[in-house]
């Protein structure tokens, strides 16, 4: 059987498929295609990282292990995919950390505003013992194995009302947040009227003027054409979003030690490629979004940092005071 065709068992009923998959994976030397879920498409910062992972996996395993990527949430929304990996229904996937805070409080760290100053700060923290500790908590609380701390990037505000030069400029603006209490608190502290809303409804809400404002990394803002319904891009850089590449823990543990080592090595080889691509896309889309007619503003960030201090103080006990402090003050 060639390594890029599906084994017959994937067409069998799910329970049967799972037990066969586990059995097949348990025998080193058996060929295995790993289904991988992605929220965005193949040209995104996520796609570039996952495809590099697949390439290295095939090379290191001499064709025995390969991936089948499923783009644009085809296997379910991020929360369902994270749950699916834990239950053994989804093999592997990349997800923002947003839904993970619902399972493990410590992951709310990545919802907190102005924790990381720049990419180097975030990478150094995630690649340290703190990243390992969070990965351990994911194994215990979600039954998933974090293979590599890939990224979505820093999040920025867009709106259709005005430039943001100061938090006061957010007053009276109806802002959409992800379904996270931390994010609602953050945007209310900055002066906006914050409303949590499912991702699938956001574009229409902005188009119809039900919402004025949203926030996302630049590649996502470009990818979903927010420039069609938003006039202002404000480089608020308020949150750093990792996008961990993960595998169901039971599936990972079913591989031989040799294959586990290959999977981890492939992920580590893909990591710098993914992060570099993410930063390059950020620069490219900043230029392209301006060319598409968005007014780009780079506000002084100190007043924003100051305005959200109460949010960090409120949530630090939930996330863990030590973890929050370690992140903010991490030497890099």
Walk through the language-model features, giving the residues of each:
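Bacterial N-terminal signal peptides
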Residues: 11-23
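Bacterial N-terminal signal peptides that target proteins for export
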Residues: 2-14
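Sec/Tat signal peptide C-region and signal peptidase I cleavage site
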Residues: 24-28
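N-terminal secretory/targeting leader peptides
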Residues: 18, 29-121, 130-332
């Amino acid at each position: 059987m060639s390594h890029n065709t599906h084994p017959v068992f994937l067409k069998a009923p799910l329970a049967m498929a799972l037990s066969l998959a586990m059995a097949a994976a348990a025998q080193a030397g058996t060929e295995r295609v790993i289904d991988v879920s992605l929220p965005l498409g193949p040209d995104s910062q996520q796609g570039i990282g996952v495809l590099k992972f697949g390439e290295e996996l095939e090379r290191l395993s001499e064709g025995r292990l390969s991936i089948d990527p499923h783009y644009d949430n085809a296997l379910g929304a991020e929360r369902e995919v994270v749950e699916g990996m834990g239950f053994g229904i989804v093999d592997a996937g990349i997800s923002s950390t947003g839904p993970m805070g619902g399972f493990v409080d410590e992951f709310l760290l990545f919802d907190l505003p102005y924790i990381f100053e720049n990419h180097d700060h975030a990478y150094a923290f995630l690649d340290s013992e703190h990243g390992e500790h969070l990965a351990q908590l994911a194994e215990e609380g979600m039954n998933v194995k974090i293979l590599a701390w890939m990224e979505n990037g820093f999040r920025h505000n867009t709106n259709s009302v005005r430039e943001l030069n100061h938090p006061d400029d957010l007053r009276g603006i109806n802002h959409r947040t992800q379904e996270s209490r931390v994010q609602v608190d953050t945007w209310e502290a900055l002066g906006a009227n914050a409303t949590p809303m499912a991702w699938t409804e956001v574009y229409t809400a902005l188009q119809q003027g039900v919402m004025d404002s949203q926030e996302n990394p630049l590649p996502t803002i470009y990818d979903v054409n927010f420039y069609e319904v938003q006039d202002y891009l404000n480089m608020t850089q308020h949150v750093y979003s990792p996008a961990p590449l993960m595998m169901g823990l039971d599936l990972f543990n079913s591989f031989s030690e040799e294959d586990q080592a290959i999977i981890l090595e492939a992920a580590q080889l893909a990591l710098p490629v993914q992060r570099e691509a993410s930063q390059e896309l950020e620069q490219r889309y900043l230029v392209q979004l301006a060319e598409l007619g968005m007014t780009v503003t780079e506000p002084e960030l100190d007043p924003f940092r100051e305005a959200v201090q109460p949010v960090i103080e409120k949530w630090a006990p939930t996330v863990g005071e030590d973890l929050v402090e370690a992140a903010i003050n991490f030497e890099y």
